Amino acid sequence: MRTCFIFLGTIYFMLNAISLHAQKKPLDHSVYDGWQSLGERKISPNGQWIAYTIEVQEGDGNLVVQRFDSSYQLIFPRGYGLDFTNDSKHLLFKIKAKYADIRSARIKKVKPDEFPKDSLGIINLITLAIEKVPNVLTFKLPKDSSGVYAYHSSKSTDTLVRVLSDSVSIKKDTSKKSIPQIIEQVPDPEQKRKLSPKKKNDESESDIELDADEPGTPGASVPEGTDLVIVDYLHGIKKTYPLVSDYLWSDNGKILLLETTTAKRNTTLKPSVLIWRAAENRIDTLLVGGNDFRGFTIDKNGYQVAFLAERDSAFKSTQKFYKVWYWKNGDPSARILVDRYSKGMNINWVISQDFSPYFSKSGQRLFLGTAPAKPVRDTSLIDIDLVKLDVWHYNDEYLQPYQLRNLDQENKRSYLALVETASGNFRQLADTDMPQLMVSNEGDGHQFLGVSDKLYRKSMQWEGGTRKDIFSVDPHTGKRTLIIKALDGIPMISPNARYIYWYDMEKRHYAVRVGERNLPISTGIKTKLYDEEYDMPSEPTPYGVMRWLENDSLLFVYDRYDIWQLDPQGKKIPMNLTKGEGRKNHISYRWVNTDPAVNYLKQDQVIYLRQFNEKNKFSGFAQMNIGVPGIPESLQMGSVSVGGLVKAKQANSFLYTRERFDSSAAVYCSYDLVSGRRMSTINTQQANYNWMTAELVEWKAYDGKIATGIVYKPEDFDPKRKYPMIAYFYETLSDGLFNYLAPAPTPSRLNIPFFVSRGYIVLAPDIRYQKGYPGKAAYDYVVSGARALVKKGWVDSTKMGIQGQSWGGYQVAHIITRTTLFAAAWAGAPVANMTSAYGGIRWESGMNRQFQYEKSQSRIGATLWEKPQLYIENSPLFHLKAVKTPLVIMANDNDGAVPWYQGIEMFTAMRRLNKPVWMLNYNGEAHNLVERKNRKDIQIREQQFFDWLLKGEKPSTWLKYGVPAIEKGRNWGFETVLD
């Protein structure tokens, strides 16, 4: 009997040991860097190839290239920036330098020129040959054609020059310097450059004379250009041009525009603008000499070129005047099209150097930017004698901080103008009275949309935005016709310019300008076209516009679930295109744009929709014929989160992603979106760790409404155990039920998978607000949710914590003044005192914070002097005597959203009251942590804090004793206190 007992005991011990060995380990802080995610994703135009990047949080990722049928796969370490040629014959991509090499260079503080450089990868998708080119800055492909590409090297090779005969030939003038027009590299076996002793048949020496106004010569501070390589793989041509600083393809690939610089060792070479003609394989010179070229543009057909050039001033001049230069096919060289003296130019206005010109689709119009000339800077003034002062005036359009924050943008502000390319007629369209202009029909429209908020800017201080006057602008004359005044809404113009239309936030409808009247076109719809759950004290935002039908014949808009068809003439009653199927089943249908090049829908076009079930959070894809109203055909729907749908240009081949809370995002391919083939698998190491499950939970909140949230449980969850719990919240999070959450050092949000893996339950409750009582709403939903979980029997009511960042941080701070339920609280960037925060500045934008309380997220809905009691009631600072929960505050001294003195107010008050409180100030950090080292640091501190108070582990020294300033940078306080 004794022997049997010993034997059975041995078996039990062995089985228990095996069970323990099989247990999955919890996540720790070492896992972050290698955790993977999907990055770029593309499908070849013919639908036969896909490519995507797999990125890691810190380190080197991979580029994966696969046949659509999964029959072939290539993996390229560090590949990114991928693009297929339009004929699907090649894939080009960049290859990053190794992360370790870049990090080493940063540590050694090497010069930028000596940093490790990217390379270029080229795959021939027909032969599967692979080419790697080192030291490449960029590569470019024509948008709409194939057969050619170009890449820009970061290196300049030693070069002797000779002039190409196919350059434009202009008669020599021996009284002026003559300069070589273009140089071609001639490689020898040692990859050195030397002069060829014999000219090829298509080459001869020629010169071009300098411009008549003798342009200035750039100084040494202008970077010298580097080699540009042009490849015509259809004809086996490969040419290298040195000293290139910029380049641009025409959409059809017929021409390549090049900008070249002077050479440090050959100052007779002048900066130039050139074009390479693909058909003739030759270079033409458009312009030689100048201080600065910029804003290059080519028309859609590759027949016209325009750019800005500054050629007249000294290189270091404080005032420069740019001109618009223009070339069309057949011209011997570029000519001036517009300058500051052109007829129609406003007095004392100039061509803006900060606006890149562009052609209309037809090429008949060239759009450019102009601006008032800036006053000449007085260089006689000595900086140390200048007073540094901001003068705030009560009639300023914008507050001084807003002006200063946007100073660079304002200095670069440009006003749209156009010039007719055939006649050269110039026309100013926008100006300081009407600064915004939206063109239509790709620049060829008969009317444009003008917008002005000039009369309403002051009220942005408390409104958060501005009302707008809306104009119809005639591009032929510049005449403006007022359409609607003081609109609180969203103005738009139809693709073909037939209609100016808008959503009116106050009247809550869509309206269209028809003839001389403004016509509401959605008033016949009984369901709301605006956010039904909007709970801020301002007008609700619309669900939005889907698209116009071709010829501007119909407008499609969304309600919460369905798609509506509106007649812009108001003659046909609005039609529910999806027949109310969405609302009936709580499914929202949203169009997925699978052809970004087209800005309208065609009659009888089959469109693809993402469908999302609001009740169970399932998602998938559906399709319908836009010309046949009816129930969308569901293609796939399930307990996953789908997205990223891409369609091949020339085939019914689709690429998309699927993910779940327990499975990383994966790339899928499909021919019909009904069945899909999984193409990628990442984060296989997850199988070694105790992961998490996620489920929806409902309970009755204290305001009497049914509340919803997500409960995250450990994979090895045992309902017989009592778990510590952390509630994490912001506003509403439950729609993300199936989103995959990677373990990562966060900007200061809760690292949910990390804590769940280590034995915590996490509750993410949705919060519904009532105007004037945001703090009470947080209490009603968070506390009721926590207690509802306690009733389930597997949450320890004495070991519960709360965590939130920003708006969530404020709610954490408020909740602990209302209850002692929680044993630990963590508040990132909280507002403690609404009365002092109300008049503060959001330094990142320069905006005053008043709008946030009166109209936006803080949801008070009144000014401080109208309802001061609400500001006090909702401010944690005034109720801190009741606090018993230990609190950690993160308040960073470069926070541009919540003034960090809010954290100081809360910390110093709790310290004065002898309440347990800590504050973390990451020096120089923003509202949300940016630097990865700081994100890693805060993850460790959050774990130590919650483990101490919710798991009973020993505290670390920063919690027990703090970190004195004298030890800053030497002692981080992570060590465990052993006494």
Where are each of the predicted segments found?
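Cap/lid segment of the alpha/beta-hydrolase catalytic domain
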Residues: 524-533, 673, 681-799, 803-806, ...
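Hydrophobic/aromatic beta-strand patches that form the interior of the parallel beta-sheet core
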Residues: 230, 427, 449, 668, ...
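Beta-propeller folds
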Residues: 12, 21-653, 659-663, 669, ...
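Glycine-rich His-Gly loop
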Residues: 453, 612, 659, 728-732, ...
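Active-site-proximal cap/loop segments of hydrolase catalytic domains
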Residues: 742-979
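Short strand->helix junction
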Residues: 263-264, 312-314, 716, 734, ...
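Bacterial Sec-dependent N-terminal signal peptides
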Residues: 1-24, 831, 840
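Catalytic P-loop NTP-binding/switch module of NTPases
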Residues: 676
